[in-house]
Amino acid sequence: LVHITLDVWQDKVYYLGKEYPAGYFAAGVLNVSHNLVVTITGEGGFLLDAYAIAKFGDREQLEELLPVLWESVENMLRSLRQVPPFSLWNMEAELGKMRVMLSKDHIDQLLDNPEEKMWFLAYLRAGILLPISIYHFVIAAWHLETYYLHRLGKRDETHFAVAFHDFYHDPSTKEVLEKMFAPTIEPFDANPRLRSSYTFARDPKDEKKMIFVNRVFFSSYMDFYVYDLLNGMHWGHAPSLCECCLKYFLTTDSHKPKYCDGMAPQNPHYTCRQYGAMNQQKEKNANHPIYRIFKTRTNTIRKHQERGKISEELRKAAIALCEEIAGQGPLRHRICSGGVPETDGAGGGVCGGPEASGR
C-alpha cells in the first residue's frame, strides 16, 4: 500500500507478473461506486485522527489504539478488493501482514525499532491519502471522459492530446477540481511524480530475445492513475462508457465502440457487445422496407379474415408465409422493390418472394 511499481513496455504494462494494455487501471478505477468511496474515505479519516497517537503515543495508548486501528485497516483493504490494482492483490496475505503489524505483540518493535516504526507510519499515511487520491482522480477523469473524450469522432493520440489539453486548461475544470473535498491533498495533476529505471525481461513476442523494460515507481496512487491515463492515451487507449451496462472500459483502437465485452446485465447469456448488436439489428429491421410492407400486408390479411373474406386457416397460412419471407430480407440484404405480387386471390400480398429476389 505504501508504493506501487509498474513495468512499462510499448503499449503494455506489467503488474504482478501479468500483462495489461496501457490505461487499463485508469479506466477500471472509474467503476468504483459512490458507497465504496464513502467507505474508504471514512476509514482514511479515522486513520488521520489516529496518526498522531500512533506516532507519539506511549505503550498504554498504543495498546488501546491498535485493535481499532486494525479494524479500520481491515475494512479499507476488504473494500479495496473491488478497485484495480488492489483487486489483483492476494488480499488475504496482505491482511495477514497487517494483522501482525497491528497486534499488541508487535508493540515492542514499534517502540524500540525506528525502522519498524517508520514503516508502520508510512502505511498509515498511505491509508490516509489513498481514498482521497481515488476520489479526486475519479471525479477528474469522469469529467474528462464525459465532456471531452466521449464526443471524439476519432480516438487516437492526436485527438486525445488535444482533448486533454482543452480539459486541463478549461476554467470550468479548475473550478471542478477546486470544489472537491480537500482539494489541496492529492490533487489531480497532469505532471505525475515518478522515479524510473530500466530492467530486463524476455520479449513477450519472442522468448529467445531480451528487451529493456521501463520500471516506474510511484509513491502516490494519484500519480500512478494519472500516469496510466496519460500513457494509455499516448498509445491511443482511453476510457469510454459502455451504453449497455453503463460501466467504463478501455478502448484500444481509433474507432469508438459503444459496448464493452463484459456480460450484459439485461441478458447474462450475451456480452454487452452482442446484446447491443442484437438491438441494433432489431432497430434496423423495424425500419426496413420489407418489414414496413410486412406490417401493412399482415394487417390487411387480418382485416380480411375479420370481415369474412378469407378463412382462419387461410389467414394463418398467409401470415406464416409473410413471416418466412420477411425474415429473409434484412439478414440477406434482400430489398423489396417495385410492386407487391398478389397471392391466392385473397388480396394478401407478400414481398420478397423468389421472383422479387431474383431480379
What are the residue ranges of the model-derived segments?
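Short helix-coil boundary/hinge micro-motifs
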Residues: 1-250, 281, 285, 289-308, ...
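Cysteine-rich micro-motifs
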Residues: 254-275
